[in-house]
Amino acid sequence: MRIIDSVADMQAFSRDARRSGKTIALVPTMGYLHDGHASLMREGRTRADILVVSIFVNPTQFGPNEDFTTYPRDLERDLQVAEAAGADVIFAPRADDMYPAGFQTYVDVEKVTLPLCGASRPGHFRGVTTVVAKLFNIVMPHTAFFGKKDFQQLAVIRRMVADLNMDLSIVGMPIIREPDGLAMSSRNAYLGPQERTNALCLNRSLAAARTLFTDGERSVARLRDTVLRILTEVPGAAIDYADFRDSETLEPVEAANEKTLLALAVKIGTTRLIDNCVLGEEQ
């Protein structure tokens, strides 16, 4: 496995690979890798000749009072996880190489970034789309893999790729969960033992909504009441949003159907967690 920390070296590697007819898969990450990331890598491994995993804690997607400085980092462990999952190349650039002095160009997807996380984290998605566009230009992948836990992020990236005629395929991969149902996330490392138990309320509320939907409930108001009841029973849980949206457009809906997205963002203590499900999809 090769480690590349220079933008120029990564571009040179990818140009040579493409010239020789090889296909490239990219799994973009911020590091502190877990089995969710590994599932993306394993899928990427099956779909391309070369698997590149980027590890970069992107400063432009963090707000002024967010956790950029404390975001968990462990490069040595990340290298072991990536190699075990079949990575050929780790691209771990420096911030001053990605954003050199004088940098002033950003990619801003408009409508689909406004609700959900976009409402409570202004500027977040501008940072995400900018760094992802840069990674696409640097790594030059044929295919890139993203987890559906960040459902809105996946929708935003799909929109950017379509609107800017980027020549690659975007693959969304299922949420990977701990045995007790908690969605895997690097931020789970922040949770204390009691908070870790309390965090199970997210998946519990998703499961309750899915059960009601399967039993015939279509009223978003009644489904939301059930979700909120479960979340508010948990001490220290602060709800950012519990929203029902069309899973393709992210527009709000009043009557649920098979393609309705239930998206959650909840703070457990000081840790903001997100989770989601599409009501008609098997989990």
From Swiss-Prot:
* Record localization: Cytoplasm
Biological processes, Gene Ontology terms: pantothenate biosynthetic process
Enumerate the residues binding ATP: 30-37, 147-150, 176, 184-187
Question: Which molecular function GO terms apply here?
Answer: ATP binding; pantoate-beta-alanine ligase activity
List the active site: H37
Which residues are the signal sequence here? none
The pathway that the record names for this protein is:
Cofactor biosynthesis; (R)-pantothenate biosynthesis; (R)-pantothenate from (R)-pantoate and beta-alanine: step 1/1
What cellular component terms from Gene Ontology apply here? cytosol
Family under the similarity heading: Belongs to the pantothenate synthetase family.
What name does UniProt use for this protein?
Pantothenate synthetase
Name the gene behind this protein: panC
